[in-house]
Design a protein with these regions (language model features):
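Extended, charge-enriched "interface" segments that sit outside catalytic cores
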Residues: 4-142, 419-428, 439-440, 462, ...
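Active-site phosphate/pyrophosphate-binding segments
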Residues: 229-414, 453, 500-526
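Flexible, glycine-rich loop/tail regions that form catalytic "lids" or insertion modules at the edges
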Residues: 1-73, 312, 316-325, 343-346, ...
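Short glycine-rich or small-residue beta-strand-to-loop segments that form or flank ligand, phosphate
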Residues: 147-155, 207-213, 333-340, 377, ...
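Short, solvent-exposed amphipathic alpha-helical segments in soluble enzyme
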Residues: 164-169, 198-202, 224-226, 350-358, ...
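Glycine-rich phosphate-binding loops that contact phosphosugars or nucleotide phosphates
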Residues: 128-136, 142-308, 507-510
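Acidic, Ser/Thr-rich peripheral helices and adjacent loops at domain boundaries
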Residues: 413-449
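C-terminal structured subdomain/cap of oxidoreductase catalytic cores
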Residues: 449, 464-517
Length: 526
């Protein structure tokens, strides 16, 4: 029987708190460090590997984390989730994003349909539509091919799909699978939509409107912006727009769209990149086969997350180490540092994924928790970040755990040899150097040049950023965050924190304000 208990009521957590702290500067130096790098690694899907040698753990800490995983019933809770139990208690919903890429357990029926069948049917509809667009069977009014796809959405309808598109754009061009350029309109700031529309030929563009409810204010505002642009160009908007929405939304059966593809209430926006939300734009941009490869990588990583052996489950171990850093070592934030320019927006996606999921101060039963939960997430690609905020990471007063991602090979393959090494070798040399520099530091009599070390990090290493590798990487972090939510006993699948601002904004626009809200409204000439 599954029990949902607060972290600080678990005896295994109390025992974890008593385990002797690991001194990174000692264990990562010399041959000790070399042995750790070889020992502390777990294979992932798509040729990736999770290496945690530079984390503040040893065999004693790992044993205590294993006991915590067992007492918190992490494997059992994941099993309950993928078998269709109501895990999103706040909204009384199932949590089924894993089912968009595979069925891990029993068949799940909801709304009178088999959900795996529902998701695969939508994928097939999207694939058929994308193939017809690419073949010139679906065209603009002049019979000309569409060359650009523009996604209109916000939050999870933008951050994830945008990050995935940018991650695979160069790979697709190199591997001759690049079909259409993709653009994204998300912010209600009119300059966002205007800038995108000014940069494209609207006559050869197809727009993907993404809104589960069909009532999202920012998205519908931007839809109107786009419709005006199409009308001003003498074009019929209904011949240029498709919708990704729920079957019950007002968009579902509207004549305003060429086609509609469906999602449901069991996949939260931030977990929707492998659903129709990501599927439509990525299939149009790169072809359905590439999207299928992306799903395959995620599916294989999901299977690894089922392993009850913590030391063979990269997602569960990553999650537990993060809990240890947050709740025992007291570190308030985590930096995500991909050494790949293609992953330039991946930290922003993980920021939403993590902070919207686990940025909670009450447990699953609505009771206040008296321990820290989700950390602040930020990041930037390397080596750019080294010339930005790494100063604080190395010598600041706060210790910030680091999550590196690196690949042995570039996507495009074009490179140059300068001073006996290629650019890719320089990139990889920097990430290796940073891991050791953060862990070991460097003593100096000049305190301004002294590096304390003891800054923990992990790295996910792969051969190349491919669709399968990207899918595995995404699933790793989705599952890590899920496991952490289980440990903290919070509901990782709702987001009530985004609601209050929306309510007040509507009051401002209706001129129903008083007090400070009215004064701020007046200052902004609303």
């Amino acid at each position: 029987m599954i029990k949902w208990n607060n972290l600080n009521t678990l005896s295994s957590f109390e025992n974890l708190s008593k385990v002797e702290r690991v001194k990174l500067t000692e264990v990562m130096s010399g041959e000790n460090g070399a042995d750790r790098v070889k020992k502390y690694t777990i294979p992932m899907a798509a040729g990736l590997a999770y290496n945690y040698a530079a984390k503040q753990v040893d065999d004693d800490v790992l044993e205590a984390l294993t006991k915590l995983a067992e007492e918190a019933q992490l494997a059992e809770k994941f099993e309950a989730l993928y078998n269709g139990e109501v895990i999103n208690t706040g909204e009384k919903r199932l949590v089924l994003h894993h089912m968009t890429r595979g069925q891990l357990g029993e068949a799940v029926e909801a709304d009178g349909v088999d959900k795996r069948t529902f998701y695969t049917e939508q994928q097939k509809k999207i694939a058929d539509f994308a193939n017809k667009v690419h073949a010139g069977e679906i065209t603009n009014a002049a019979g000309e091919k569409f060359t650009t796809v523009v996604q209109i959405g916000i939050g999870g309808s933008d951050l994830g799909p945008r990050a995935m598109y940018l991650a695979l754009e160069n790979w697709a061009k190199k591997n001759n699978t690049f079909k259409m350029e993709a653009k994204f309109i998300s912010n209600v700031d009119p300059d966002d939509a205007a800038a995108v529309l000014n940069s494209i030929d609207v006559a050869h563009s197809i727009f993907v409107l993404v809104s589960k409810s069909g009532t999202t204010l920012e998205t519908l505002t931007n839809e109107s912006f786009v419709k005006d642009a199409l009308k001003n160009a003498g074009l019929d908007a209904s011949k240029h727009m498709i919708a990704v929405t729920s079957e019950t939304s007002p968009l579902a059966k509207s004549d305003d769209y060429l086609a509609a593809f469906f999602m449901d209430d069991y996949i939260g926006g931030r977990f929707s990149s492998t659903s129709a939300v990501g599927g439509a734009v990525l299939s149009l941009a790169f072809g359905p086969e590439v999207f299928a490869q992306f799903l395959q990588g995620a599916a294989e990583e999901d299977k690894l997350a089922m392993n009850k052996n913590v030391l063979e489950n990269p997602e569960m171990l990553d999650a537990l180490i993060g809990v240890y850093e947050r709740n025992v070592l007291g570190y308030p934030s985590t930096a995500v540092l991909p050494y790949s320019q293609a992953l330039s927006r991946f930290p922003a996606h993980l920021q939403q994924l993590d902070m919207e999921s686990n940025g909670k101060s009450v447990n699953r039963f609505g009771e206040a928790v008296n321990y820290p939960t989700g950390p602040v997430i930020f990041g930037e690609p390397g080596t750019n970040g080294q010339h930005s905020f790494y100063q604080l990471l190395h010598q600041g007063t706060d210790i910030v755990p680091l999550q590196f991602v690196g690949f042995k090979n570039s996507q495009i393959g074009t490179d140059v040899v300068i001073q006996d090494s290629t650019s890719q070798q320089k990139l990889c040399a920097n990430v290796a150097a940073q891991i050791v520099a953060f862990a070991c530091g460097k003593a100096d009599e000049n305190k301004n040049k002294n590096f304390e070390g003891g800054r923990p990090s992990s790295i996910i290493i792969g051969e190349e950023l491919t669709p399968e590798a990207l899918g595995a990487l995404l699933a790793h972090f989705e599952n890590k965050i899920m496991f952490q939510g289980f440990v903290w006993n919070v509901n990782s699948f709702d987001q009530e924190g985004v609601q209050l601002g929306k309510v007040l904004a509507k009051r401002v626009l209706a001129h129903e304000t008083d007090g400070a809200l009215k004064v701020f409204s007046d200052l902004l000439n609303i």
